[in-house]
Design a protein with these regions (language model features):
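C-terminal peripheral helix-coil segments that are non-catalytic and often amphipathic
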Residues: 1-8, 102, 143, 147, ...
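N-terminal intrinsically disordered/low-complexity leader segments
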Residues: 1-16, 79-88
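Generic hydrophobic, amphipathic alpha-helix propensity
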Residues: 17-25, 42, 67, 71, ...
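Helix-turn-helix
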Residues: 20, 28-67
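Short hydrophobic clusters on alpha-helical segments that form packing/core surfaces
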Residues: 21-29, 107, 210
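Conserved hydrophobic residue
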Residues: 34-35, 133, 162
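Hydrophobic alpha-helical connector segments
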Residues: 66, 79-113, 167-174
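Amphipathic alpha-helical packing segments from all-alpha helical-bundle domains
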Residues: 98, 109-118, 122-124, 131-158, ...
Length: 216
């Protein structure tokens, strides 16, 4: 294997420092909020000089936006898991009920993850100052989740398993049946989330109520 040259080593060191900065900044933003986090604190926690931080990021706003967009982009694997569940072959009402329960449980688990809750809380708090970032977060997270659910409902409706005249509304209703007060409770009560058994109960109830309204 060829040894790395000076340029490659320099790029590697730069990338490492950049990662140290973004990791430290994310932890501080989530813990203290945007306004109460300073570039001095970020530099100290990252173990670099403030000059190094400013060499990588023009200002705190730029750093915050890059971090938030980067974390939001990591939701792809969750959506892939939800898509795989939603694409499970379904041919009977019982199949549909089981698939809805699995979809509901994974959806609830994803939203109840502490990093997700912390980021959501932070984005909401800074939405007025960063409206485009808040919009990006919504489009990449909640909206994509609803799009996925709507697509699954359309397929099941075409199979004759559901009768929902407004699929987007039905997708929103399913999402709220799943998340409901659990999400609000977790956001406003320091991340307190339902225990596994309660999540299963919520998922089953959501599937049952949804099918009571739209099942054939």
């Amino acid at each position: 294997m060829d040894e790395l040259g000076p340029a490659e080593l320099a790029r590697g060191r730069t990338a490492l420092k950049r990662r140290q900065i973004t990791d430290a900044a994310l932890a501080l933003f989530l813990r203290n909020g945007y306004d109460k986090t300073s570039m001095d604190q970020i530099a100290a926690d990252a173990g670099v000089s403030k000059q190094t931080v400013y060499k990588q990021f023009a200002d705190k706003e730029t750093l915050f936006e890059e971090i938030a967009r980067g974390v939001t982009g990591k939701s792809d694997h969750i959506l892939d898991e939800l898509t795989a569940i939603a694409q499970t072959p379904v041919s009977t009402g019982d199949d549909l009920r089981k698939t809805l329960q699995r979809l509901a449980r994974r959806y609830l688990d994803a939203v109840m993850e502490q990093p997700v809750l912390s980021l959501r809380r932070l984005i909401i708090a800074e939405a007025d100052q960063f409206p485009e970032l808040a919009s990006h977060y919504y489009q990449q997270g909640p909206q994509r989740g609803l799009d996925l659910i709507e697509s699954a409902l359309r397929r099941w409706s075409e199979q004759g398993l559901l009768a929902a005249p407004d699929l987007r509304l039905a997708a929103s209703q399913f999402a709220y049946l799943v998340l409901g007060s659990s999400q609000d409770h977790a956001l406003f009560q320091s991340g307190q989330t339902p225990r596994p058994a309660e999540r299963t109960r919520i998922a089953k109830a959501a599937a049952s109520m949804f099918l009571a309204a739209y099942g054939r």
